[in-house]
């Protein structure tokens, strides 16, 4: 990534760059590889990773994976009784990276399939949003709009946001449009 960052900074010195680790942007790879040791580039003005306020760390969080990616209906608490621990652990690790390197962190992908009872999806999204807010982690949900065949998409062209209004409110703080 260092060569890419140097090239971009030549023409766009203040462009926001979001950099994640390898292997699906797991937080453990953010904290291991998005560091001055691995991003050891030096720009023409002598600055580098540590000096760049417009370089953010990126990670994905899919805990519990059986719930977020599972194709069968699951009770998030019964089937994954310690699911919150994995979420909090990832958030804490990302936040520690942010504080150590004085950089913002962005959870660029999180979410779950909508084949579960909606109350479980609502509980999951409410918890995730609250945990990110505690640490000022920027985020985007995967995914709000896609197509009617995608099991993660919140919006359906035939019935809008019907059935997921509580999830949309958790994510946006507002009732979904009609």
For the regions a protein language model found, what residue spans apply to each?
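Aromatic-rich peripheral "rim/lid" segments of glycoside hydrolase catalytic domains that contact
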Residues: 117-178
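Extracellular glycoside hydrolase catalytic/binding regions
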Residues: 1-135, 157
